[in-house]
Amino acid sequence: LAILATELLKQFVRSNMGEIASVNNVDIWWEDYGEKSNTTVLLIMGANASALYWDRTFIDELVANDLHVVIFDNRDVGKSSWFNSEPLLVKLAKFLPHAVSKKLVSSAFKSMVDDDGNFAMPDGKGAKYDLNDMAKDAICLMDHLGIEQAHIVGASMGGMITQIIGLDYPERALSLTPIMSSPGVGDA
């Protein structure tokens, strides 16, 4: 029980860290690890997934290898700006330990894209942005943090965003690593 309580406390503290950057007309929650003077790895999580889903052991290993790591919540996720009404479960999840909030958020969403490439939102209305806007969010966050170039790593939809960064902002990427991703939405 003591081990569980300690782990829940660690997750709670971690979920209440980070900062908000106002970039690209949205508020983006972000957090970083390691020395800012080291080469940066920007980790981009997938659809409806908080940046806190990145495994802390993975982040610690990157930092141990002299890298600076930046994670952030995409739009309509976690503590970043919401364009439609934020689901009650997500509001609640912001105040709960990460292990509990992860389960709530996962059950609150179904990752869907409509025929126009817009993200389907819980209220049934399509979002007024696309993956290109989300790639620009990442680049604007890098600008905000004074990061010229970074290794860009994205999981799932984050991998699609990573690929767009490579196409639209190649001078900003030291390398691109899409994980569990595809080349895009629609016909391949």
State where each predicted segment sits.
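Low-complexity, intrinsically disordered Ser/Thr/Pro- and acidic-rich segments
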Residues: 1-4
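N-terminal cap/lid segment of alpha/beta-hydrolase-fold proteins
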Residues: 9-27
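Conserved HGGG/HGGXW glycine-rich cap/lid loop of the alpha/beta-hydrolase fold
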Residues: 26-120
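A structural alpha-helix within SAM-dependent methyltransferase catalytic domains
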Residues: 59, 139, 167-170
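Catalytic nucleophile-loop/oxyanion-hole region of alpha/beta-hydrolase
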Residues: 87-91, 123-135
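Conserved acidic catalytic loop of the alpha/beta-hydrolase fold
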Residues: 103, 132-150
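Conserved hydrolase catalytic core segment
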Residues: 148-187
